[in-house]
Amino acid sequence: MSMSFFSHNYLATYRKRWGLSQRQLAYLLGWDSASSVSRFESMGRLPNLMTALKIEALFESGSGDIFPGLYRRAEIEVADRAKVLYRELEGRTDPKSQEALALLAYIIRRS
């Protein structure tokens, strides 16, 4: 997958759907400048956790819906690490390892 796929987001779509200007969205998110919104919309800047939560609260949509490319990138990275950890734990029979293996298998299957 190309990097442009991972940088795709719908922040501008959500903002425009609700008739907000970049300046108005910046205000709602507690920012001083509309240029910050522009950078997020063009993925020149990645949202930190608080920003992502504010955007979710504002539009009542999950980060994965608003930032699907970024979400997919995170999903792939987690799945890749889950595969490595699964191989490390494979063969262990203690209950905690079995629980972890079940979670890791689920993560790998859904990726």
Outline where the language-model segments fall.
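The short coil/loop that forms the "turn" connecting the two helices of the helix-turn-helix
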Residues: 20, 31-32, 61
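Short, solvent-exposed alpha-helical "recognition" segments
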Residues: 44-49, 75-77
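A short, Lys/Arg-rich alpha-helix, primarily the initiator
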Residues: 1-18, 103-109
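DNA major-groove recognition helix of helix-turn-helix/homeodomain DNA-binding modules
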Residues: 50-65
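Recognition helix of helix-turn-helix/homeodomain-like DNA-binding domains
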Residues: 30-47
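Residues in the recognition helix of alpha-helical DNA-binding motifs
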Residues: 14, 28, 39-40, 69
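Short, charged recognition helix plus adjacent turn
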Residues: 67-111
